[in-house]
A protein has these predicted regions:
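Gly/Ser/Thr-rich phosphate-binding loop
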Residues: 13, 17, 21, 29-124, ...
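Short Gly/Pro-enriched turn/cap motifs at secondary-structure boundaries
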Residues: 127-132, 177
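AMP-binding/adenylate-forming catalytic core of the ANL superfamily
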Residues: 156, 161-162, 185-277, 290
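Flexible lysine-rich "adenylation lid" loop at the C-terminal edge of ANL adenylation domains
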Residues: 244, 286-308
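Conserved ATP-binding/catalytic segment of the ANL
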Residues: 68, 139, 146-147, 151-206
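Conserved anion/nucleotide-ligand pocket segment
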Residues: 1-6
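Residue-level signal for inorganic ion chemistry
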Residues: 21, 85, 138, 192, ...
Length: 309
């Protein structure tokens, strides 16, 4: 792809990056989920948006109008939005795909410089993070990679030589054959498209033997009304949703604490309609402070596995 002679770059540590090859490259350190929730979800939550989700074949002019509104949220003049760092809401993704919004989802690690999987928006498959990038080889460590999730392993020229002066840590992540073990679970279809399910260390195993990937449930819950962030934990073999509400939004709409509690319970009921029987959420617990985060802004899950109350 041609890149213009004059390109302006505004750089920060990205969770969402806008590539504007025409004139501008931007990267955002802000949580992209909030951007989409505040500005894109309202486009879906109306008659036209709901029609698009039900009927893929609609008037091109309607699609173009919806696409322009969505693109204007990000300034309008860009070639592609690259999303990464957290699961993407399925309804939002399907809507963006149907209106031809130029987004793609990438997967990577700092240790791989950092992209492992990515595809141009025109070819990206729904729910996937694309295919192995150039000079990278990607496999799923599973007896049936298309249907049974396994660990993503990769190797190639993008891979680091190792952690500086830490051979022990290097040997724990890169095996003797040069494969880096990411710790992420995924499936891969026959065309090589990778769909991430979650972190292996985060997977929940019920007494009935069901594997539950909490990130998949959280991505749905985080896009529901007045939810800022959430965690799904297993307590006494039952799934519990820990929710930090968007108090500013709730109070702006005149909600009191009892109203927020009712809204969270309504979210639980709606969420359960979207989930299989073995993933049903039995209880919601409200947190009044943000969850503790790592330096990479990931929630410190280990601190909340024993849900109180």
């Amino acid at each position: 792809m041609h890149i213009a002679e004059v390109v302006t770059i505004a750089k920060s540590l990205p969770l969402l990056r806008l590539n504007t090859y025409k004139s501008l490259i931007l990267s955002y350190s802000a949580d992209y989920r909030r951007i989409f929730k505040k500005n894109i979800l309202p486009l879906i939550d109306n008659k036209i948006g709901k029609l698009l989700l039900r009927m893929p074949i609609v008037n091109d002019k309607i699609k173009a109008d919806m696409r322009k509104k969505a693109m204007d949220v990000f300034g309008g003049n860009f070639d592609e939005i690259i999303i990464g760092g957290a699961p993407f809401n399925a309804d939002v993704e399907r809507f963006l795909k149907q209106i031809g919004f130029p987004y793609t989802i990438a997967y990577g690690m700092t240790e791989c410089g950092p992209i492992i999987c990515s595809s141009r928006w025109e070819t990206l498959k729904l729910a996937s993070c694309g295919k192995a990038t150039t000079r990278m080889e990607v496999k799923i460590d599973s007896p049936d990679p298309q249907h049974v999730a396994g660990e993503i392993i990769c190797r190639g020229s993008n891979l680091m030589l190792g952690y500086y002066k830490n051979a022990e840590a290097t040997s724990q992540i890169i095996d003797v054959n040069g494969w880096l073990h990411t710790g992420d679970l995924a499936t891969m279809d026959a065309d090589g498209y990778v769909t991430v399910r979650g972190r292996s260390k985060n997977m929940l195993l019920t007494s009935s033997g069901q594997n539950i990937y909490p990130e998949e449930i959280e991505s749905k819950l985080n896009n529901m009304p007045y939810v800022s962030e959430s965690l799904i934990v297993l307590q006494h073999d039952k799934l519990v949703a820990l929710i930090y509400p968007d108090f500013d939004d709730a109070f702006a709409h005149g909600l009191q604490q009892t109203d927020i509690e009712k809204a969270m319970e309504a979210n639980r009921n709606e969420l359960n309609l979207l989930l299989p029987a073995y993933c049903q959420i039995t209880k919601v617990k409200i947190h009044f402070e943000e969850f503790e985060k790592t330096a990479k802004k990931s929630i410190k899950r280990f601190m909340y596995q024993e849900a109180k109350g």
